[in-house]
């Protein structure tokens, strides 16, 4: 299956067993890029763990690698919680806010994806859109950790690319339908706490499916290969059984428009609904 992956590196505010020097980070990452990038369906992502876990020398490693490999993917964290935002400002004085630090080091590009991106503002979303970079909405992780509520409405205002993510480290599921369920709840909570609730729109089922499929593919610059059923694309998909559980069958039986059926899947479907899995058109399950 299609995959973009990378080995994270960090050297500040981290246990000694997880810390590596800038020299090690460069050598290790370069070796992995040369070994795995553009090999079959695999691509590599330069992965500076998070700005508050990086010295200036360590983050400069990512800059160097991006210059050496102009089309390489970059993945990192952005403004996941208030504490990390404050730490970045203290560690990189004079370089602006969290996103400004990444931009200063040349890491905001059309190949960059920024996980979480909760505590950012209009200026940041505008810059992300201008650079054609992407953010990854990780609702189960954000709710589990109490990090905050992602503002998909603000992302849409500036046409910033958004992908739906599970965040396996702190997320509570790898199931896409269940992750979509939590994404919907995040927008509902934003509405509850908003100064002007009428300005916050619920996450429409069509948009939810979009960020989980084609939107995610576009965020990763892979939409020429995956994300939809257009002829010529790679056929990676699942087949769902809408009668797999009594509650899903009941909910679906009362769904008339397509939007209702899609909403039923994202709210009450779970892994039991997966009937078949196809990779490159070959049935695996």
Positions of the model-derived regions?
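Metal-coordinating catalytic core of metallo-dependent amide/deamination hydrolases
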Residues: 1-117
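Conserved short loop/turn motifs at secondary-structure junctions
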Residues: 47-52, 143, 197-198, 225
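A conserved active-site cap/scaffold subdomain adjacent to cofactor or substrate pockets
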Residues: 122-123, 129-166
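Glycine-enriched alpha-helix->loop->beta-strand junction motifs that scaffold or abut catalytic
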Residues: 2, 66-71, 107-110, 127-136, ...
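His/Asp/Glu-enriched, well-ordered alpha-helical/loop segment
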Residues: 104-107, 111, 153-249
